[in-house]
Amino acid sequence: MANSKQKNLLVTTALPYGNGALHIGHLLEHTQTDVWVRTNKMEGNNVLNFCADDAHGAPIMIKAKEEGQDPEEFTKGIQIEHLKTLKSFGIEHDHYHSTHSVENEQLVNEIFTDLVKANLVYEKEILQLFDDQEKMFLADRYIKGVCPSCGAEDQYGDGCEVCGITYDAIDIKKPISVLSGTEPSKKKTNQIFFNLNKCKDFLSSYLDDLSIQESVKNKLLEWLGGDLQDWNISRDKPYFGFKIPQHDDKYFYVWVDAPIGYIAATKYYCDENKIDYLNLWGKDSNY
């Protein structure tokens, strides 16, 4: 007879990025999760522990180029090493997936199509840094320069690790291409943006009903206190990621498909094991 108090739990951990070895922070989180999962299984709960490698983006392209490898093959090798490390610490997963998967691409495209139908995305012409030697537009991690706020040197094109500010790559001072070491020019290009302000009321209402620590909730509500900047969700080719439907030269920014990777891992497991649904979905990530 089934235990009426049995809980069905889906547990996830932050996705390790596929450009290098696991660090102590990864191992701490995965160890804590593994202990919690084992404890709940011993208590008779139905628990599934999923994770995946975050396998897209500019840093992977840069590292793969340094290693003289194709990005896809490079990330496959990194994932093998990640799994070896986790196994050596006795950490087990019911399924370990990758964001570079058929399931994830399918889900990303479905969600993007729904966003288009809901008029939550639009195309806009912007100025962007361009490497004239490599003949390509430069995503944030392809650029280093001086922080436009505090003046710290050797900062990436998306944010300063010294003062914590985020900015557009076009605003960084004394920009240098990570690829060629040259100063980039500025060129116009069309990018696809997600209208965050249209979702502001929904997000505020959602947070009000969410059972999380008050300090975390207050910080998130603080972010929603003013106007939200629209989010550039596209990147120009060449880029290691998923192509955007009806935009042959555009790819989804890695932060579009990475969170959906949790759903993709779940879909893969459910399809393989003929499970219709799971009762709880959780992710310890404010962003």
PLM feature segments, named:
Residues 105-123:
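Hydrophobic or amphipathic alpha-helical targeting/insertion segments
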Residues 2-51, 103-107, 150, 173-287:
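Structured secondary-structure scaffolds
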Residues 119-193:
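Cys/His-rich short segments
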Residues 74-77, 94-106, 132-150:
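Aromatic/His-enriched, Gly/Pro-containing loop or helix-boundary segments
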